[in-house]
Amino acid sequence: MQPSRTRVSFFETGETMKQRKKSYLSIFVIFFSLFFFGIFMYNDNLKSSIADFTSSNPFSSSFVELPPDECDLFTGQWVFDNKTYPLYKEEECEFLTEQVTCLRNGRKDSLFQNWRWQPRDCSLPKFNARVLLEKLRNKRLMFVGDSLNRNQWESMVCLVQSVIPPGRKSLNQTGSLTVFKIQDYNATVEFYWAPFLVESNSDDPEKHSIIDRIIMPESIEKHGVNWIGVDFLVFNSYIWWMNTVSIKVLRGSFDDGDTEYDEIKRPIAYERVLRTLGDWVDHNIDPLSTTVFFMSMSPLHIKSSDWANPEGIRCALETTPILNMSFNVAYGQFSAVGTDYRLFPVAENVTQSLKVPIHFLNITALSEYRKDAHTSVYTIKQGKLLTREQQNDPANFADCIHWCLPGLPDTWNEFLYTHIISRR
């Protein structure tokens, strides 16, 4: 007796095979759906990571195109540009002092903020705060000099502070030194008050309104000890030399209580001071670790007749730069526009004759065109905002020395920025 066999017809086998194929197909579809979903999610995360990197990487947004070394950055013209200038807004920089906040102090026109310096044969790189801060990481940038260098220091603080999160930046003053600290970069942007660079009776950062200003042209160590170890030093000294035709030079020492002095012609005293600075640089600066700059003179705009506006009152009624570039403000018709050009070659020659290089930034001529950019009557005097009556008396109260911010000093810092980011 043979065991019974289960018979499977060909019809039944075909159906089973179809069911198996459907099962395999379903598994295949599910597998590849999960696979492609994973790829999609990975790409999404990758895109997010790339986006995060791009936003935090200062070099990713655009390639910084530097001007060629042979290009003269200081010969060019002012171009109206209300799309990319100003580089920051007055109300967005909490660190600006009342001395320079012209719009807040009542100035109605703001066109002075919209002028861009265009070199004749090249272009300045667009200012990028993150690129600069990377160069300043673990470093110190210090401005040393008078209130015009403080003007430029305030500008630099505003240029970089916008990319720093709240609570990650601070400002502290101790004596002559004011320090803006950027925590995430362990970097500082500092200002050191030394209006004559050498020792003087005007060295108090708060109380220096002295009629008889006296200097010690060969004494710089008291200040210089505070400059040791700084990575980028930016010197200036000019406006305090312009109060008198001659300069009082102390016989002896302030520490010894000496009060007698000699009066020396301004260019001679200026050269003595800059040679003292040069000697200090040569003996104390390692050019491999410290870069030194010297800013040329920041001009005054006191006489409106100098720029062919006999009806003007100092700089008070000026709303546009000198736009006729055929006038040579430095050596031609406008040679008297706020600059003692006897001092210019002194500064240029001394800074270029040292063993340690000093980069001479020639801001003078291009700044002479900017009769419109001063604080004028929209500023303070003796620590207090000008009253309405004082504002209505520009002949006596217009400040045609300092500059509104945002404004011209931002351009000076664009030159400085170009040099710093070009440093290998």
UniProtKB/Swiss-Prot annotation:
Motif (DCXHWCLPGXXDXWN motif): 399-413
Membrane-traversing stretches: 23-43
Domain of life: Eukaryota
Protein name: Protein trichome birefringence-like 28
Its job: May act as a bridging protein that binds pectin and other cell wall polysaccharides. Probably involved in maintaining esterification of pectins. May be involved in the specific O-acetylation of cell wall polymers.
A Pfam family reported for this protein in Swiss-Prot or TrEMBL: PC-Esterase
Residue ranges of the motif GDS motif: 145-147
